[in-house]
């Protein structure tokens, strides 16, 4: 087994310090070689992995490591590697000609940091480089066994002796997704998929998972190759968490329109149930080509209900975008129908926006050190919130569609500028980003996945937090689908913890 090397200031050596549980994790990563590192989000997966890789460098086990990570985290990885080591790191980014130069630099670098999309495009360059270790950060990117991305990463990882998958939630919603991740880590652990399927998954008439079984057996089979630490395991080293659920009532006009759209949604759901003999199967509904139109009817109404909860202006904006001939295939036909029928004419208030702005104002006024991270599903909503908070503070947007460099610039401004105290992010934008300089997090609306909710909250629940306690505030419209959504997420979270 390679010896641990935590000396200071020497080439290819880790220059930081680790908590005892991180040191234990490094030892197992070095001893076994193929490991699923399942430390809870915020517990230091990155620094733990860097320590392990540096020890491999020092013991001459490897001379180059490939780090595959979401695009939004590439520069965060670069900074962490430079912070804790003297190793050379190159980030593969930019247009084709610039990436070609990056790959040439990779020949003389210890770490290559790349997102899977760039890797897929640049395989001719990668094939000229020899890596002996691979790290996949946010390993849920491998959860699909059939995706091109997953197949490619597993293929290039196969000859590498050291394979590390990093995730805060090894099981998000589906054990079969864990199986796919384990195919990357060590395919011998869970064996052939047919056996795994029979042992752990109960399927319905259409072949879709109905429920899961023998989960303790699954857990036991992973003990040799998985390192798992929950928040409870390291609670004394994390900031205290204060949860707030803030109910917001509709105004009269908004409530009336919400009821109207809800009745319309219920009608289409009943039509779908009638089609399937009174037993509505969501999977069959979504996977039956003949049901595409009905699926669109249901989802369009759900989306407009969510827009109405967030800010009625989103419905109007979506309607106008749909009507714009310069923006084909954008906007919502149903939102346009609602707007053109005059149903939005009396809906002038946005109770949730007002409540959130008031909350942010109070938080920022309470202490000049307070900083706020806010998540919302709709990117357009983030822009509306930014406009509404202009007089309170400078803010940055961080969302899908921005380049990795733009995201990194936004993060650095929020981190280093005392006057930039609001970080506005979409779920796609904020995946895995470390924001220990913030002590308040607002879920303006809720995702459907408990894993995404954990991802949101873990942005500020971190070992590196600058505060003894952090506050997570969730805003929920009363009498709306958001109340049920919140309950479902709490149930999913309980199941995941179990």
Q: Across the structure, where does each feature detected by a protein language model lie?
A:
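A conserved SF2-helicase RecA2
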Residues: 448-455, 461-498
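Conserved pre-motif I regulatory segment
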Residues: 2-38
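SF2 helicase motor core recognition
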Residues: 120-124, 173-175, 382-386, 408, ...
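Conserved P-loop NTPase motor "coupling/switch" region that bridges the ATPase
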Residues: 62-64, 83-86, 107-108, 133, ...
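Conserved Walker A/P-loop ATP-binding site and its immediately adjacent core
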Residues: 48, 61-83, 172-177, 377-380
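Conserved helix/coil segment N-terminal to the catalytic DExD/H
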Residues: 97-131, 144
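Conserved helix-turn-beta segment of the N-terminal RecA-like "Helicase ATP-binding" lobe
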Residues: 73-96, 189
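Conserved Helicase C-terminal RecA-like lobe
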Residues: 43-44, 48, 53, 57, ...
């Amino acid at each position: 087994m390679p010896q641990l090397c935590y000396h200071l200031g020497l080439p290819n050596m880790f220059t930081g310090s680790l908590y005892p549980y991180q040191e234990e994790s490094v030892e197992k990563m070095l001893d076994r070689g193929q490991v699923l590192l399942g430390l809870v989000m915020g517990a230091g997966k990155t620094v733990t992995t860097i320590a392990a890789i540096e020890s491999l460098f020092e013991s001459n086990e490897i001379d180059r490591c490939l780090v595959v990570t979401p695009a939004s985290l590439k520069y965060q990885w670069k900074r962490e590697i430079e912070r804790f080591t003297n190793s050379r790191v190159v980030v593969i980014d930019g247009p084709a000609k610039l990436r070609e130069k990056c790959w040439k630099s990779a020949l003389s670098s210890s770490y290559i940091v790349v997102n899977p999309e760039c890797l897929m495009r640049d395989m001719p360059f990668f094939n000229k480089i020899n890596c002996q270790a691979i790290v996949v950060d946010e390993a849920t990117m491998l959860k699909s066994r059939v995706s091109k991305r997953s197949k490619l990463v597993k293929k290039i990882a196969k000859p590498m002796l050291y394979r590390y998958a990093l995730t805060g939630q090894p099981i998000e919603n589906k054990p079969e997704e864990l199986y796919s991740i384990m195919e990357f880590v060590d395919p011998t652990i869970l064996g052939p998929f047919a056996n795994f399927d029979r042992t752990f998954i109960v399927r319905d008439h259409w072949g879709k998972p109905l429920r899961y079984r023998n989960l303790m057996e699954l857990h036991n089979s992973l003990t040799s190759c998985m390192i798992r630490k929950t928040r409870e395991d390291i609670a004394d080293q994390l900031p205290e968490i204060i949860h707030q659920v803030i109910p917001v009532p509709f105004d009269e006009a908004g409530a009336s329109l919400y009821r109207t759209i809800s009745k319309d949604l219920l009608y289409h759901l009943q039509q779908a149930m009638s089609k399937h003999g009174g037993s509505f199967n969501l999977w069959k509904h979504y996977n039956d080509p003949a049901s595409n139109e009905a699926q669109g009817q249901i989802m369009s109404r759900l989306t407009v209900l969510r827009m109405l909860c967030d800010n009625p202006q989103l419905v109007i904006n979506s309607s106008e975008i749909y009507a714009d001939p310069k923006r084909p295939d954008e906007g919502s036909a149903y939102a346009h129908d609602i707007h053109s029928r005059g149903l939005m004419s009396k809906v002038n208030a946005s109770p949730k926006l007002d409540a959130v702005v008031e909350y942010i104002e109070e938080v920022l006024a309470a202490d000049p050190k307070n900083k706020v991270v806010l998540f919302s599903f709709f990117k357009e909503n983030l822009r509306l919130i930014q406009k509404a908070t202009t007089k309170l503070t400078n803010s940055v947007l961080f969302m899908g569609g921005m380049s990795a460099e733009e995201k990194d610039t936004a993060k650095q401004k929020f981190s280093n500028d005392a006057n930039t105290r609001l970080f506005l992010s979409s779920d796609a934008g904020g995946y895995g980003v470390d924001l220990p300089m913030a002590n308040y997090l607002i879920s303006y609306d809720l995702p459907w996945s408990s894993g995404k909710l954990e991802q949101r909250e873990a942005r500020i629940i971190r070992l590196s937090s600058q505060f003894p306690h952090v506050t997570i505030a969730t805003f929920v419209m009363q009498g709306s689908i958001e109340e049920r959504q919140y309950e479902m997420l709490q149930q999913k979270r309980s199941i995941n913890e179990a």
